[in-house]
Amino acid sequence: MKIISQQRIKSLGISPKRCVEWIRESFAMKAQAQLPAKISVHPADTDFFTSMPCLLPNPADTGVNFHRQYFGVKEVHRIEGAVPSLGSDLMLYDAKSGELLALMDSDWITTMRTGAVAAVSAKALRKTGAETYAFVGLGNTARASLLCILEAEPEKHFKVKLLRYKKQAELFIQRFEAYSNVEFEIMDNIDDMAKSADVLISCITSATGQLVSDEALLPGITVIPVHMRGFQNCDTTFDRVLGDDTDHVKGFKYFSQFKAFNEIGEVLAGNDPGRTSDQQRIIDYNYGLALHDVTFAAKIFEMLESDASIQSVEMIKETANTSAFVTRASCVTVVVLR
């Protein structure tokens, strides 16, 4: 078993553009993957552990260039008072042999696949000529989203508006100083920002009520609430609601009142036109799929599989055919870095 840390993953220099390509590739596999619903337990109050399993399809059936069929399960946790409070790890298996191949720190994977999904969804659903993107919540997820947006379309110039919060907007702009295809404006009022946006991406992790008035969400806007918070008012008024998985949103309070719903993967596959008018208001809920996590993990594992410098752990298994313990070598690579 290989132990793969975040530091080692980052050292691979995986570009945001490649992350976008992996997201498109993984969405194309969704119909053939086994993707059970997430399971969560709650030790106390807002603390949680969430398990996210996924069996990728046999590569022979998809044309994806994997060396083997993979199963993986990501464990996400949030513990109040822990440092960091939010983290995730992923176990990757050979689906044919049951061998545990790797234990990975999956914080980088989670951030970048989330950003790539937002970028892909925004491009697929935005109106004709859209160029103004607005962001609220300017942490790592927002940065990953904009990195993927800019690098996936280097020929396109973007106007990006940021909601002011402490010094986060200024620091956010500094991160993108090297990019020539973007200009920034900092705004103080979220409704004013929304009115001027073609695409509104929210990366806040908590909200006690609606963030933006319905009147500020003008015809043609695309809203992507990355962490699902603050836009419940859109559920009954918007022309279309998209999601990464039906099971993720069918429990929403107003699901039965959606005017039109489908999965974003159907849009990416060309089975659904997505936006049919530049006047439509569209919201896309991407709750997060283990499909993406396991695809990223498999790609990373195959990039590192032959790297002898990575820490490996030998697993000792007891066989049913003998009373003695027999060594069954299980090369697992685990990379852990917070």
What name fits each language-model region?
Residues 1-111, 119, 126-129, 262, ...:
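N-terminal ligand-binding/catalytic initiation module
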Residues 10, 230, 234-323:
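Adenosine-phosphate binding glycine-rich loop
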Residues 118, 129-150, 164-168:
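Glycine-rich adenosine-cofactor-binding loop
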Residues 134, 159-161, 185:
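A structural signal for isolated positions on well-ordered beta-strands in alpha/beta enzyme cores
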Residues 149-153, 176, 215-216, 304:
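Active-site catalytic pocket residues across diverse enzymes, especially alpha/beta-hydrolases
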Residues 152-176:
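NAD(P)-binding Rossmann-fold cofactor-contacting core
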Residues 182-256:
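Rossmann-like adenosine-cofactor binding region
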